[in-house]
Amino acid sequence: MAQQAADHVALGIAATDARDLRTAVQHFEAALAQDSMNYEANWRAALTLGLMGDPYPMSAKSPERDSLYARAERYARRAVAANPAGADGHFALAASLGRAALMKPTQEKLRSAKLIRSEALRAIAINPRHDGAYHILGRWNAEIMRLSALSRFFAKNFLGAKVFNQASWNNAIFYMEKAVQLDPGRIYHHLALADIYADRKRLRDAGAQLRLVDSLPVREAMDTNYKQQAASLQKRLAKR
């Protein structure tokens, strides 16, 4: 049974590399049907389901997207339970919580933020070269700074989340630049960094990142989508 689970995980990884997310998650879930606490199958299923939900517009309600994100969180929590010392499980949980939080009202988003940050930090403590966890921390800082001053005041004073005092644009840039440094071939890092630079009116730096997005080869399932987002951002920046 363990070998059957391992075979399905290997097939899921191959499907991921082929950018076939639906087939990948089928194999990861087949592995979990054999061994529900298989650490790698759980965290990989969580990340794959999250990616499958990403194309749905954030501005519209989507039960399908919400279901994908809920399944992702469930698998990520199980991965952490199966192997608390594994960086990828903590990263998958931070990513799953982060995706779900983006769909929620501000107050609910803030309630999730502390755990998202702590899970990403835990992943980095275990693996200091985890580019995905640095990406989440960069995004975390940026999303907190994008909130209104009133929302941040509410978080600090009524939710008891003093951790929000540590959020800054400088941290957002530092962590996202670190993600780019660790994996310069990952398109998503460059797109997110361009977005942060644009927020800080560093338009030349943003443009440089967007040109990299355009020039880099498609490597992952969502890369074509990210290239489209980058082209859209480039058009908006050209009007400034």
Region roles according to the model:
Residues L11-Q26, T48-A85, A92-R129, R139-K178, ...:
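Short coil/linker segments at helix-helix boundaries
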Residues L150-G160, D183-I187, G207-R240:
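Terminal, low-structured helical/coil segments at or just beyond the last alpha-helical repeat
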Residues M1-E40, T48, L203-P217, A231-R240:
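Extreme N-terminal leader/anchor segments
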Residues E29, R77, L121, A194-D195, ...:
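Amphipathic alpha-helical segments within well-ordered protein domains
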Residues N170-L212:
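Glycine/small-residue-rich hydrophobic helix-like segments
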